[in-house]
């Protein structure tokens, strides 16, 4: 029994993966985070399976993945990001964490916008790292939407802290792990 499962990172896109996602959606009763190949699998084989879910679902697409999930162009999404995101989250009763220069987190009714991340996060592995943060914080309180937003805020703060020591162009996503305790302490001290 796991309180939260994250899947999709590097698993590939296939009908077998779709069957696994479908099984989890219909049988797992806690929180399921779907990222990367998991999102692309839903886009290819049918996003409507989300309507059959028994669990809480967090989707973490970047704009390209979201365009594939919704069948809406990237340009259209960028023009109407809040409206399209809220409608999608409401329609599928999920939390959507739409990653871009800013990150929009919504459940369709309430939304957060994270603007504190640096461009240094726009590189391979950053989405996986963020999914890991969300995985770790998803059940810290009863407010799942807030927990996802807090994960994004921490992710942004990690990039800010790391940039004080490491040039933005040299920063590796794995470098962020060195700053987690410092950022968490800073947040706790700010209370």
Question: Predicted segments — roles?
Answer:
Residues 157-191:
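Charged C-terminal helix
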Residues 10-11, 124, 137, 166, ...:
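Hydrophobic alpha-helical scaffolding
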Residues 68, 123-154:
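Short, small-residue alpha-helix embedded
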Residues 76, 154-157:
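A short structural micro-motif
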């Amino acid at each position: 029994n796991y309180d939260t499962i994250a899947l999709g990172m590097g698993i590939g896109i296939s009908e077998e993966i779709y069957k696994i996602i479908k099984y989890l959606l219909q049988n797992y009763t806690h929180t399921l985070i779907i990222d990367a190949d998991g999102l692309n699998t839903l886009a290819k084989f049918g996003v409507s399976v989300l309507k059959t879910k028994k669990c809480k679902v967090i989707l973490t697409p970047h704009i390209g993945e979201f365009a594939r999930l919704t069948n809406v162009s990237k340009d259209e999404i960028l023009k109407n990001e809040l409206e399209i995101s809220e409608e999608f989250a409401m329609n599928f009763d999920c939390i959507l964490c739409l990653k871009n220069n800013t990150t929009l987190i919504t459940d369709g009714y309430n939304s957060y916008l994270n603007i504190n991340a640096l461009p240094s996060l726009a590189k391979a592995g950053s989405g996986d790292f963020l999914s890991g943060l969300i995985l770790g914080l998803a059940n810290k309180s009863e407010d799942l939407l807030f927990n996802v937003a807090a994960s994004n805020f921490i992710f942004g703060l990690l990039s800010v802290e790391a940039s004080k020591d490491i040039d933005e162009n040299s920063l590796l996503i794995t470098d962020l792990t060195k700053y987690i305790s410092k950022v968490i302490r800073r947040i706790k001290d700010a209370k």
